[in-house]
């Protein structure tokens, strides 16, 4: 009997898109049940986001390893938790998937669930350890808050509430992240998508309440005509005042002073954050322009 292949065929994605269950099953006449995509971190069939639920059930019944891992030690449970696929996560748990299996950076599937409240609720209900720590010594709640962007705030508030009800406490790190989230949102509030503004603002207020964090004040931007008065007692404080009042969330500033502050900030980020990795003639032009 010929030895079966360890890798999936190049057209496996197309077969999944076609939703032909018989054709998908036929792949495993020649491939191992745990065969993987050679071009995607050795991701096995069970971990494909769009893999049909019926094929998952069939593969497990045929003997596929329900806890099979990719190059980063992520299991199918981790993959489907990442995209909030409650149905597939429920199937994997029902079939005996390891709810505490650790991927790279010591992350369990609960870390993979991120800010998705639905799959987080399911994992917690099934006994996932909310106090697990990754390699940064953060809990799933802390790790989730650390990555939240403004568009995620509403979901993050619901997810954070689940963790707090499950017994986690508002740590110093978690509170710092709430302030960061608030500062980022307020900086971009003026140009935030109005369709989601009310929902997002409500989520932010809920985060402040859950973690007992003082709300970040709304930005008061300069009107482009009044005198610009900076009152900080250090140049750093005066610079931040100028940044907050004169620099828009994107695009050029409305005043010359604001544009100088914006360019200085951009150069500062390139020097300190990127170690001049993107430094080129355009950056030098900007530096020369504000240096007089």
Protein language model features and the residues they cover:
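Ankyrin-repeat intra-repeat helix-capping/turn positions
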Residues: 19, 51, 84, 115-117
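Ankyrin repeat (ANK) tandem arrays and their immediately adjacent linkers/low-complexity segments
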Residues: 106, 115-121, 132-292
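Ankyrin repeat domain, specifically the short helix-to-loop turn at the C-terminus of the second helix
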Residues: 26-33, 57-65, 90-98, 121-129, ...
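A broadly used, surface-exposed interaction patch
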Residues: 53, 61-64, 69-86
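Alpha-helical segment of the N-proximal tetratricopeptide repeat
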Residues: 10-20
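Ankyrin-repeat boundary/"N-cap" motif
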Residues: 5-12, 35-50, 69-76, 102-111, ...
